[in-house]
Amino acid sequence: MDIVDMIASSCTNIARGELQQFNHIGDLTTTPEDYYSIIDGKTVGPFATGTAAAALVAGASEEVSEMMYEFGTEFGRAFQLVDDLLDLTGDPEMGKPRGTDVHEGKMTLPLIHALTILHGSEREHLADVLSNFSDDRWNELTSLLELSGSFSYTRQLIQNHVDRALDILSKLPPSDACLLYTSPSPRDRG
C-alpha cells in the first residue's frame, strides 16, 4: 500500500472511530471490543500509519514498514490508555484537566472495566455516578474504580502494550536508528 492510500484509510478510520464514539456516549453497555474499535480508528490509526509511512519514506522495506505499523498500533494503544487514566487522575498543572471525558460521557476503558467487574449495588452505584456525574461525585467515582481494580488493570494493559511495542522494535534489522533504541535513556541511568 502506498503512503497516500495509508493516510486516506487512516482518515476514514478516524471519522469512523469518532462516529462510533459518539454512538457510545453515555452507553454503560459499551464493551472492551467497542472501546478498542473506537480507539483503533481515532487514535491508534494515526500512530500506526505515521510510523509505517515514516519507515517507507526512510527507504525501509515493506516488511519493516509493516513491523512499524504494528509498533505504532501498540504504542498508540498505550498512549490512549494513559490518556484515559490521566482523565481520571490528571492535574491541570500538568496540562491534563481531570474529568473531561467523564463529563462528556465518553466510555473509557477504566470505566468499562469497572462496569464489567462490579455487580449488584456497587455496579448500580457506578451507573448512577456516571449517568448523573458532577464534580462533587469524584470521590465516589475514584473509590468505585479502586474497588474494581480498574486503575491497576489499566496500568497493566499499558505496560503490556509498551512491552509488545518494544518487542517489535527489538526485532527490527540492525540500523543506526536501532542504536538509539538500545542506548540507555537518562531515566535508566539512575
Task: State where each predicted segment sits.
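All-alpha prenyltransferase/terpene-synthase fold signal
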Residues: 1-183
